[in-house]
């Protein structure tokens, strides 16, 4: 008895249009080949996208071309795909996969043509390619974006992208450029001067005063007669200066106070140093010098004591001799 494998229905593939395959007896008796149904059945169950299998799509294209001639994507056998919604137009592809894949469906409502551009760098861009990809311009721009270093609120690009950076950060209104240049250029704030300080020293550029007016005795600034203070680095009224001084009275007083404080502290240290050391007499110094140990010379104290004792003995002998002579004189008289 033959085994028909009724328990394995996975080997039988039926299309969606064949609701009742046993109702038509002609299909089992005749080997009639329907190109439209075969075309739809072949491609309804294939869900592989064409970009992944370009060689397979080319083989299917050649197979259908040999059977039916040039492939035609008319609407006569694709009317059952109207319910699909696509993002692309009918000019996106010429492969048979356009009938099965809703992304390449020819009857969908496509966006305006200005939002799309053809990508000719795909895998099928050669001589034997049978499809062209339609990629939105936003995606194309993402592929060609430049890589920059984002620090804070600004992105820094390489030197090769100077044109791109200039176009990115250029000002929208041309009038603002002249105003910005005039504000960024440092000029002297004295009335009637307005000297350009772009090439002056950093001190003059920072405080917006030229070298001449920074040393002048009288300068008209902000409608008042003033003088530039060397320590404050700003203009003051003439009443705040003493005679022809270039620094204001307040800053000079602070400067003098600091100088006096320095001198007082220095003199105080000198006084404390001299007060600790007491003056020494020459006898003390001689005694200390004599008391210092010396290996060669004998101590001087013993010699002096010896001399004093010898002087005392001689004095006592002389006094005894005189007393004896006196006694002899008085006795003889």
Curated annotation (Swiss-Prot):
A single GO BP: cell differentiation
Compositionally biased tracts (Polar residues): 264-284
Mutagenesis or variant effect for residue 247 to D: Complete loss of DNA binding. Slight increase in nuclear import efficiency
Subcellular location field: Nucleus; Cytoplasm
One GO MF term attached to the UniProt entry: DNA binding
Binding site for Zn(2+) 1: 188, 193, 210, 213
Keywords: Cytoplasm, Developmental protein, Differentiation, DNA-binding, Flowering, Metal-binding, Nucleus, Transcription, Transcription regulation, Zinc, Zinc-finger
Residues noted as binding Zn(2+) 2 in the record, renumbered to the chain: 229, 232, 236, 248
Tissue: Expressed in shoot apical region and early floral tissues. Transcripts levels increase in developing pollen sacs, and decrease in later stage of anther development. Strongly expressed in the placental region of the carpels.
Effect of residue 248 to A: Increase in nuclear import efficiency
Zn finger residue spans: SBP-type: 185-262
Reported impact of residue 233 to A: Slight decrease in DNA binding efficiency
Matching Pfam families: SBP
CC cofactor: Zn(2+)
Xref: PANTHER family: SQUAMOSA PROMOTER-BINDING-LIKE PROTEIN 4, SQUAMOSA PROMOTER-BINDING-LIKE PROTEIN 8
Function as written in the Swiss-Prot or TrEMBL entry: Trans-acting factor that binds specifically to the consensus nucleotide sequence 5'-TNCGTACAA-3'. Binds specifically to the 5'-GTAC-3' core sequence. Involved in development and floral organogenesis. Required for ovule differentiation, pollen production, filament elongation, seed formation and siliques elongation. Also seems to play a role in the formation of trichomes on sepals. May positively modulate gibberellin (GA) signaling in flower.
Protein name in the entry: Squamosa promoter-binding-like protein 8
């Amino acid at each position: 008895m033959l085994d028909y494998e009724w328990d394995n229905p996975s080997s039988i593939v039926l299309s969606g249009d064949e609701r009742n395959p046993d109702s038509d007896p002609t299909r089992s008796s005749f080997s009639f080949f329907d190109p439209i149904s075969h075309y739809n059945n072949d491609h309804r169950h294939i869900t592989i996208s064409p970009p992944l299998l370009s060689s397979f799509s080319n083989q299917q294209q050649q197979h259908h071309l040999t059977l039916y001639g040039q492939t035609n994507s008319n609407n006569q056998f694709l009317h059952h795909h109207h319910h699909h919604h696509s993002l692309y137009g009918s000019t996106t592809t010429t492969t048979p996969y356009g009938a099965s894949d809703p992304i390449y469906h020819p009857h969908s409502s496509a966006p305006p043509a200005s939002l799309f551009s053809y990508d000719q760098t795909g895998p099928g861009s050669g001589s034997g390619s049978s499809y062209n990809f339609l990629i939105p311009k936003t995606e194309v721009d993402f592929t060609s974006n430049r890589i920059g270093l984002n620090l804070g609120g600004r992105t820094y690009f390489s030197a090769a992208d100077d044109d791109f950076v200039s176009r990115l950060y250029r000002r929208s209104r041309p009038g603002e450029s002249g105003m910005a240049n005039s504000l960024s250029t440092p000029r002297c704030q004295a009335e009637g001067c307005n000297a350009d300080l772009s090439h002056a020293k950093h001190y003059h550029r920072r405080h917006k005063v030229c070298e001449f007016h920074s040393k002048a005795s009288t300068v008209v600034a902000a409608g008042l007669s003033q003088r530039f203070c060397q320590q404050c680095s700003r203009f003051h009224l003439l009443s705040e200066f003493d005679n022809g001084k270039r620094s204001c009275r307040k800053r000079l007083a602070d400067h003098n106070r600091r100088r006096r404080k320095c001198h007082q502290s220095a003199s105080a240290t000198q006084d404390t140093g001299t007060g600790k050391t007491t003056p020494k007499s020459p006898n003390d110094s001689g005694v200390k010098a004599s008391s210092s140990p010396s290996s060669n010379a004998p101590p001087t104290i013993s010699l002096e004591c010896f001399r004093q004792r010898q002087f005392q003995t001689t004095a006592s002998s002389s006094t005894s001799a005189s007393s004896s002579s006196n006694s002899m004189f008085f006795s003889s008289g």
